[in-house]
């Protein structure tokens, strides 16, 4: 593994071969996909921390979805080396969808874990409330809620380290960066899915309250040929909760579409 930077965006690069660029969600970092890398031999796995998250500092301008998309587009061009597989979780799936719609010739495939096409009005308000909480009280309450409510009880029982890992991922976020990321998602508009041309795999949990199976299927219905996999007894943090299943599904998908 090597660390690098594209501008002020810090990235980790593992392996060699065709590029897979991973985009984490709210409260996540490049580490959100660490458990999937073992199944991806023969690929170059590129994992950035989005601006204001993880080790990437906040820029001088406010965080927006447009900035996130531009950041990943910059990474794809400068590190990807050509058409690239995109993988996202939660907020990161919307970044991937937007980029794939804008630059279809650059995207070999999409893999979306816990996808968000566009926040509902109630979700937008919850995101604004979460931003306010981060600024006023820091990350403790948000981290507790994410680690207790974001994962399924079965996943927590099977892996005692899961909830603490999700909690720590949130606790290490810069509160202002997290708040601005929430606001960016709260004002986001969805991608025009008619412009998607790449093979698309959507993976969600049957207990995912953020991206329930019905929402995942609604996205798939608008993307020609998209496939949906629903993992049983799984919440929103799919790569954490079902790493073996997610690694297998991702590996099969990118390998099947490597010549796309």
Predicted regions and their residues:
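Conserved alpha/beta-hydrolase catalytic His-Asp/Glu region
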Residues: 118-125, 137-195
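Flexible "cap/lid" loop of the alpha/beta hydrolase fold
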Residues: 97-102, 106-141
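Conserved HGGG/HGGXW glycine-rich cap/lid loop of the alpha/beta-hydrolase fold
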Residues: 9-57
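Short beta-strand/loop motif that positions the catalytic acidic residue
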Residues: 196, 202-204, 208
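Alpha/beta-hydrolase fold catalytic core
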Residues: 1-20, 41-44, 80-82, 172, ...
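Catalytic histidine-centered segment of alpha/beta-hydrolase-like enzymes
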Residues: 234-243, 247
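Conserved acidic catalytic loop of the alpha/beta-hydrolase fold
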Residues: 67-84
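Gly/Ala-rich beta-loop-alpha elbow adjacent to hydrolase catalytic centers
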Residues: 88, 92, 96
């Amino acid at each position: 593994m090597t660390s690098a930077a594209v501008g002020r965006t810090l990235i980790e690069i593992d392996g060699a071969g065709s590029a897979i660029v991973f985009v984490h969600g709210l409260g996540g970092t490049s580490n959100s996909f660490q458990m999937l890398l073992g199944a991806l031999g023969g690929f170059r796995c590129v994992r950035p921390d989005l601006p204001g998250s993880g080790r990437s500092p906040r820029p001088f301008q406010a965080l927006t979805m447009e900035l996130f998309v531009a950041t990943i587009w910059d990474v794809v061009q400068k590190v990807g080396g050509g058409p690239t597989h995109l993988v996202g979780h939660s907020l990161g799936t919307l970044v991937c969808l937007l980029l794939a719609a804008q630059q279809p010739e650059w995207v070999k495939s999409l893999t979306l874990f816990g996808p968000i096409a566009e926040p509902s009005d109630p979700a937008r308000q919850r995101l604004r409330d979460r931003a306010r909480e981060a600024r006023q009280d820091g990350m403790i309450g948000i981290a507790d809620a994410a680690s207790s409510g974001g994962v399924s009880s079965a996943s927590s029982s099977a892996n005692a380290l899961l909830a603490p890992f999700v909690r720590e991922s949130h606790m290490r976020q810069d509160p202002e960066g997290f708040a601005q990321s929430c606001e960016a998602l709260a004002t986001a508009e969805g991608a025009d899915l008619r412009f998607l041309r790449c093979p698309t795999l959507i993976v969600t949990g049957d207990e995912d309250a953020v991206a329930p199976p019905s929402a995942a299927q609604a996205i798939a219905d608008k993307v020609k040929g998209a496939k949906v996999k629903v993992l049983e007894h799984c919440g929103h943090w799919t790569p954490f909760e079902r790493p073996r299943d997610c690694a297998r599904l991702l590996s099969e998908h990118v390998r099947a579409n490597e010549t796309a």
